[in-house]
A protein has these predicted regions:
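Catalytic glycan-binding domains that act on GlcNAc-containing polysaccharides
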Residues: 1, 5-8, 15-253
Length: 253
């Protein structure tokens, strides 16, 4: 914990110099000694980041351990009350929300993507506007998406609308969240497959990787929340052509 490089890194991140801080952190963790830190040092460094609520460094540092594994560091649950309450209020599995946020932003509240998505749940401006209208958030302004609770409300509401549109398939809804809903609607039109096999056949590399990571994260979070082992296979379910006659929501962005 007394490592000056790590302290400098956390200070830089705290005052808004995120990329410099991350560079300093990564250097301190991995490059200043041959082979990098050992497991005990990595867990101590991750703990330092967790305590400072720098969740991306907490997760990424803890994931570097080779033998000792700290699941709470690898799968933290920040903003616990806000996420659980919102997910439960709209009938969404909180583990799924956490699994998605971990992949989208690593819990960095002011994360911005190169395509303009914002916040914890990386919501696009047009999607935010559409979702706000859909859920009756009449006072919504574009800049509000950077507010933590608004971001969680909009992101979870959109995810639930996508999940309902895909008849509860977490794999397809995750693909839709990443690539837009039109693509997974087409990708499901082959034979009925186990979700894991379907995910392996998603033609976009980024979306394929995303779906697998979100569902794997979700399974780990569900195990932590329930205190019971979980099945990734059960969570992925099966994916195949639409069996109900209900129409897709044509304006789902």
């Amino acid at each position: 914990a007394s490592n000056p490089g790590l302290q400098r890194a956390l200070y830089a991140i705290r005052i808004g110099l995120r990329s410099e801080g991350v560079r300093e952190w990564n250097y301190s963790v991995g490059l200043h000694v041959p082979g990098g830190m050992n497991d005990r040092e990595l867990l101590a460094a991750a703990d330092l980041a967790c305590k400072a609520q720098v969740w991306d460094r907490c997760i990424n540092t803890s994931e570097r351990t080779r033998e000792a594994i700290d699941w709470k560091q690898r799968f933290p649950m920040p903003f616990h009350d806000a996420v659980i309450a919102k997910a439960n209020s709209i009938g969404l599995d909180p583990a799924y929300v956490y699994g998605l946020i971990r992949q989208e932003s690593r819990f960095i509240m002011d994360a911005r993507s190169h395509v303009g998505a914002s916040g914890l749940m990386q919501v696009m401006p047009a999607t935010a506007k559409w979702t706000a209208r859909k859920i009756g958030m009449t006072d919504f302004q574009p800049q509000m998406i950077n507010d933590r609770d608004v971001n969680i409300t909009i992101g979870t509401s959109y995810l639930k609308l996508a999940l309902d549109d895909f008849e509860g398939s977490m794999a397809m809804a995750a693909a839709g969240y990443n690539a837009g809903p039109g693509r997974p609607r087409n990708w499901r039109n082959g034979p009925v497959l186990e979700g894991a096999i379907w995910a392996e056949n998603v033609p976009f590399t980024e979306t394929r990787d995303y779906v697998k990571k979100v569902l794997s994260n979700t399974t780990n979070y569900a195990a932590m929340i329930t205190g019971r082992p979980q099945s990734l296979k059960a969570r992925l379910g099966t994916v195949g052509p639409k069996v109900t006659t209900a129409e897709y929501n044509p304006d789902l962005p």
